[in-house]
Amino acid sequence: MSTQTLIYCVGAAKAGTSWLFDYLYNHPETYFPTVKELNYWNSVALGAGEFYRGELARRKGEIAARHAVTRDEDIHAYQLQSMADIEEWLVTFDGKTRDDKAYLGFIGAGLRDAKLVGDFSPGYALLGPEWFAEMAKSHENVKFLYLLREPVDRLWSHFRMNAGGDEAAATSMVDGYLSGGEENVARRSNYRRTVKRLMQAVPQDRLHVELYERLFTEEALEKMCDFLGIEVIPADFGKRVHGSPEAGLDPARRARLQSALKPQYNFIERYMGAVPVEWQERMVAA
């Protein structure tokens, strides 16, 4: 068998990572635990382990509640596996003690039948280059993936998710961001910083950057699978995975967000040679 690849998808949040994880989870040449967003490296690096352990415990409770009323046998089985995987991960990693061997074992590194294993944790986008370098050394064949979405759309989707469908609350978060608040979401919107840090630590041929707006196409999927070293299988491009509740963003706020995010547009223009046409189509006159 060819050398197994370990893929780290470092985000961005609300840029298609859940859809891609679902596609790869169901791929016959891969192995992934059901737990997306293990947050191992940022727990060790940033001391955020207790928060993420709490999030996983909460997620397990939500799955248990759905499991109690589920009648579909396939969904029932997946829910059982999800709860078991969460419990195993909470036992494997205490949220603070670095144990790369145990972590790699949990994600399937070394499994004979898996050409691809990995970890999809958008929180890794906040890490420094020294930690990307550590991740790159964790396995003999490590690659990195970073998905980018039109900056205002990504930010708005993130606020809608945080607001749980409350459009007024999401709009208030936008206003807070424009006033210099919402620091966590702001940091996750900094494509320039994350790409630069990745480029400091990761060889160019080990990094694949793709646009959310192009992800759901045969062409993008073929490039992705070629990079990952697996065959392309049919995809459900219409499947919605963890999408944010629908809500509109008024043109005035969109224009102000575009202005606030201008450094990101400028960087991507330099990095990709032009602002993607899909992004230009979403922009409004300031």
What label would you give each PLM region?
Residues 16-17, 103, 118, 135, ...:
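Generic structural signal for small/hydrophobic residues in well-ordered secondary structure
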Residues 35-39, 43, 149-152, 172-176, ...:
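The conserved 3'-phosphoadenosine-5'-phosphosulfate
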Residues 1-102, 106-111, 120-121, 174, ...:
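PAPS-dependent sulfotransferase catalytic core
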